Amino acid sequence: MTHKIIVALDFPAGAPALALADRLDPARCRLKVGKELFTAAGPDLVRALVARGFEVFLDLKFHDIPNTVAAACRAAAGLGVWMLNVHAAGGRRMMDAAREALESLPPGDGAADTPQRPLLIAVTVLTSMSAGDLAETGVADTPAEQVMRLARLAHACALDGVVCSAQEAAGLRAALGADFRLVTPGIRPAGAAAADQRRVMTPVEALRAGATDLVIGRPITGAGDPLAALAAIQADIEENLGRAF
């Protein structure tokens, strides 16, 4: 099976995002909708992507009091999304409330073609954050140490996985087991610019380190032929790992 990369739709409006989606194949990739696009285009954009057959990762990083986050998770499930996330820094009670809100939904509550509840993952440390950045917020640990602490908390709250840098993936995989999803942004094919993410790896490096889901944006969305760019990355994964990953 071809590895389904999560393509980040980092667009300022709905029209170019939908135009890009129409040049991709839902059998080959999933799509990520983040804060900018969701703020500009709203829930209707998510519904339109789901209607096109795409599994959508709603990347809004909910972080609020437990009741508010639980309500937001239920609303996201109603859009038919495949996966959503919260900030692990919101703490145990917030993550428990988010998980319980999704577990309380009957099968099919999200959408007619989405019988299972959305996956719920937690954000650990943003990939743009360095040790110095963390220190300025009062966190004395290194990014890797803080990632491990927050990932262990998310695991204890029975979430499905975490967002993390691929550089932390091997340690998290060893500590948290084979069934915990590791969703890794900061992925750039060999030769691509790192842009605004500091802790980056290539797709093959990230998968070898233990990542389960790769988030890739500009190398695909900025390509003249996005589907060909996606296929090239997937072919490189298969060639280097010896199988379709």
Swiss-Prot record:
Gene Ontology annotations for the cellular component aspect, listed alphabetically: cytosol
Binding site for substrate: 10, 32, 59-68, 127, 188, 197, 217-218
E.C. designation(s): 4.1.1.23
Catalytic activity: orotidine 5'-phosphate + H(+) = UMP + CO2
Domain of life: Bacteria
GO molecular function: orotidine-5'-phosphate decarboxylase activity
Pathway(s) annotated for this protein in UniProt: Pyrimidine metabolism; UMP biosynthesis via de novo pathway; UMP from orotate: step 2/2
Catalytic residues (positions): 61 (proton donor)
Pfam families: OMPdecase
Cross-referenced InterPro entries: Aldolase_TIM (IPR013785), OMPdecase (IPR014732), OMPdecase_AS (IPR018089), OMPdecase_bac (IPR047596), OMPdeCOase_dom (IPR001754), RibuloseP-bd_barrel (IPR011060)
Single GO biological process annotation from the record: 'de novo' pyrimidine nucleobase biosynthetic process
Disulfide bonds: none
Keyword Lyase found: yes
Keywords: Decarboxylase, Lyase, Pyrimidine biosynthesis
SUBUNIT field: Homodimer.
Described function: Catalyzes the decarboxylation of orotidine 5'-monophosphate (OMP) to uridine 5'-monophosphate (UMP).
Family, per entry: Belongs to the OMP decarboxylase family. Type 1 subfamily.
Protein's name according to its UniProt entry: Orotidine 5'-phosphate decarboxylase
Gene: pyrF
